[in-house]
Amino acid sequence: MKTKLRSVTQNLNLDHLNKEEHIMKSITKKLLAGLLGTAMTLSLAACGGGSTNAGTSSAAAASTAAADTGKTYKVGIVQYVSHASLDQISDNIKSELDAKGKELGVTFDYEPYFQNGEGDATVINQIASELVADNVDIIVPIATPAAVVMQTATEDNKIPVVFSAVSDPVSAKLVKSMDAPGGNITGTSDALDTAAIFKLMTTAAPDCKYVGLLYDQGQDSSTQAIADAKAYLDKAGIKYIEKTGATTDEINLAAQSLIAEKVDAIFTPTDNTVMTAELSIYESLAKAGIPHYCGADSFALNGAFCSYGVDYANLGKMTADMVVDVLVNGKDPATTPVQTFDNGIATVNTETCKTLGMDLNKIKDEFAPLCTQVVETTTAESFEE
């Protein structure tokens, strides 16, 4: 099956990343960036433009956007790993930067500085060093692990950071508070309304008595959501069991263990490790009659029964808008509040719903009072552009 083949490929990418290939790609990018930079310098010299760095973009805060017409800003985008949610975010960051660039008469040059760490901490640290050496004007890390590395890498050079899809920026020690980050960093958060997901779960199955919590203990994005889930289930008198994993293989084993436990349902927050593995576990869960409730619409796209959470397309656009505010409009990240989203949209996978033996129309009617909208999807590898 197409989706199964892809999940195996993802697993190989995550667990056996060829670092030499990454280095060669990095060298190629640097050579291309150098050639493009030389050409751009010659071109802009004639019209008085040029590329900025973190210092000059801060110095330009007092200038109007019109005065910056013709400038080129180097934007480093660091995607933590490849999966539908983060792919959608990066795609929308790029498209919004392109649109804003045309609108403002400036260029946001991200292509030579976009890199994907594929979930490998060593590679992500290497990417951080490369972006600092490239003297980019801003770094945009996507997901908590990437944001933590980029924050550390920019502490001394003061390159501003605008993160995307960080579930709990305060607990991750990226910001002092959501309203006043306090450092040279701000961004967008995909903080999860855990209680809302469990309301959907218990509405669809009022007799739900045993819930599996499936996540990666090493993912900061899961920490608070799992704590909230336990508190909710304890208060509701619902028994739960935790199963964790740090790789696709381990998540597969954890899912099989939950099937053997005969849980009534499974909950996963906005966990990147489980998201990467979803295509390889959704069929076995559905065939076992276990609905999987998750914290991002990409889970439902990849086969989970239901998700409730952030619209990642809008989150990507908002992240790009914040990048523009910092670079062009001179906003200080330290005083720019972290943006959060709560669109109240539940996404139901109609194919999985059928496999589970659930009545889609009944589910939609039951979910309607609890959501602003109920969206239908079918299993696919990625969102259509």
Where are these regions (language model features)?
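Hinge/cleft segment of the Venus flytrap/periplasmic-binding protein
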Residues: 19, 325-385
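C-terminal motif of bacterial Sec signal peptides marking the signal peptidase cleavage site
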Residues: 42-46
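Bacterial signal peptide processing site
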Residues: 48-51
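Extracytoplasmic "Venus flytrap"
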Residues: 68-95, 100, 111-122, 218-222, ...
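Hydrophobic alpha-helical segments within soluble ligand-binding/sensing domains
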Residues: 68-69, 168-210, 310-331
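An alpha-beta-alpha
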Residues: 75, 93, 186-236, 332, ...
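Short beta-strand elements in bilobed, periplasmic/extracellular small-molecule ligand-binding domains
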Residues: 101-124, 184-185, 232-248
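Beta-alpha junction/loop-to-helix N-cap segments that form part of ligand/metal-binding clefts
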Residues: 112-176, 271-286, 290-295
